[in-house]
Amino acid sequence: MSRIPVRPALLAVGVGLAAIASGCGSSDDAPAGAKRMSFELTDAGCVPNKAKAPAGPIVFEVENSGTSKVTELEVLDGETILGEVENLSDGLSGTFSLTLEQGEYTLYCPGGSDERGTLTVSGGSKAAASNPAAEAAIADYRSYLEQNTGELVAATEPFAAAVIAGDVERAKRLYPAARVPYERIEPVAESFGDLDPRIDARENDVPADEFEGFHKIERALWVDGTTAGMAPVARGLLADVKELQRKVKTVDLEAVQIANGANELLGEVSASKITGEEERYSHVDLVDFEANVEGSEAAFDAVKPLVKERDPELVEQIEADFEAVYKALDSHRRGNGFVAYTELSEADTRELAQGIDALAEQLSQVPALIVQP
């Protein structure tokens, strides 16, 4: 999963789009003077799994050297994901950039025989100068986060009540609306590693005895046709989204993290919405798709003034690409929602994927522009 880092004074730039992992976020777009570090994904995990670097901007260049067991590299500070590249199947490569302070970090390549390594960063780094435009972007996006977590709680309350009451049809009707606000802010929500698996894990993401949240209820509603045994799950889900609402109010943000989140929301579309994996029982994937795109656009809008100062033509292209994606989605609307994902043809999904790829290619340039001195 993709996550916006939450560590103070950290700058992060990353791309993890499955559909275009080898093409976006190249190291040529990295901040000037960045240290470039190359890693391979193998059956063993990250190679090398012990590395050193000076404090400051670092570009992580990651390539899958032929393994199906390991498809991502994460840099962790404790249990917090600072940056990652994911969905790298055999032959694909990707990059992400971080500005790291002195300290010891974990290199995590899940699935390898030796999953964890160490990155030691030495020396000092200068604190970022105050930037009124960046501060305005942070304030704007924080308001968006708080608005959507409020909507998430408000939509989850009646959904959970319907599940607890055993009203299958009402719960089915309310399910898509409860998903929307979470999907809009997914990278920030995922940064809270304890909460996200409880709220949004899919059946194959966690051990069977840890499977909770939206998708466990989704399976019960659409596969089993009952809410039997789901009351504790619904109560737990409601408690977790309320905890997320509280945590979002104090999350630390940087402007570049917001820009990175815009990219990572498109990565969510490529990795799980275009494939139909996310809502595999209800098939309301296009609801999630639109919410991810809306969240990406909101994050971009927050940092747009910063980007416009340096590349106004890029801003115009990104705005046009967002409109193209919405236009492609519009052709699949039905009533107040969308057709089931299973009704899409191969040509339909190809058109949607191409729109996301075109948008992501342009949007991936934004974080590097923001961190330029």
Description of each model-found segment:
Residues 1-13:
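Bacterial N-terminal signal peptides that target proteins for export
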Residues 72-74:
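Beta-strand signatures of extracellular beta-sandwich domains
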Residues 38-41, 88-130:
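Extracellular/periplasmic metallocenter environments
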Residues 25-27:
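Bacterial signal peptide processing site
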